[in-house]
Amino acid sequence: MRSLIGMTFLNSSVGQRRLRQNGIVLRLGPVVADRRRATLPHRQGHCLDRQDLETLLLWLQRHFLCVPLEHLLEGPAPTCLRIALSVDGNPAELAELVYPLLERYEMPASAFIGGDPRSWREAVAETLWQADATAAGPLLELLEGYSGAALMAVFERTGDDQRRSRNLDLLLRKLERLDPASQQALHAACPVPAPYSAGDWERVRRLENSGLLRFGLRGQEPPPSAGLCAEDCLGRAHRQLQQHCVAPLPVFCQARTTPAAQPGLRAALGRLGYRFAFGARNGLVDTRCDPLDLPRIEVDAAIAARPGRLAWRIYRGARP
């Protein structure tokens, strides 16, 4: 029913008029090579497999003009329905799994690099799933007080990935009841992703040179103190992006758990030339939006597999 309502709105004159006055930016989760990995219970559908991504791109082509992100943010185009894509993933995933489909269907996209993109839930899940006792040591010490004997059943590798993933999902749901400070402490105890290698930056340059992918700066998760982020972390990541990209986007993407850019961060973004920033809100971009707290629409595996559900999300975002 929701898909039917969404498609009716999308194809109606009222819906078309409303959407021409707005911009739609989709945030696509990381793309993995096979459906089995994407559908493990503890991933909660945040990953997309290649087949679902292709299904989504074909649907978008039928209903929208896919434009570069910076073109969409400059203002409305009353003659057509426009949409822009932002994709998550490291340079290898983008080059091997995402770019070939963007090239096939001639659809531009943006990606944000810099800070750790993982939420506390994703960081804890990934650390436990890897089952590396040395790397996970600090996290295991914190978790022992929350989960008891159930923890080792989750941490130990078994031949039954589905069962282990279900147990991990149950543990994560229990941890969701913790206060935000405790959740951020869990995140801080997880191993930090390795910095980009020379090979990663070479992939970034090749992707940018293709003309289909442009790169912007991503905020840190968990967010450091406002002063540190604005004056140290942000500036260092900005210089690295400027060094390795020919035309980096003047767009900043905040950590997903950060509500809106604080005054110190806003000032730093202005000094560094960032005119736009995405916050944590879901919705459509219009002229009334705060340019440093822009919304996007999250696309998970369920929506990518059945894009009619995206029409419902768009309908909800377009309602006054």
Model-predicted segments: where are they?
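C-terminal active-site subregion of NodB/CE4 polysaccharide deacetylases
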Residues: M1-S86, E93-A95, S210, Q220-P320
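Glycine-rich active-site/cofactor-binding loop and its immediate structural neighborhood
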Residues: A84-D88, L94-L97, E103, P108
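Metal-dependent polysaccharide deacetylase catalytic core of the NodB/CE4 family, i.e.
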Residues: V31-V32, C80-L81, E103-P259, L294
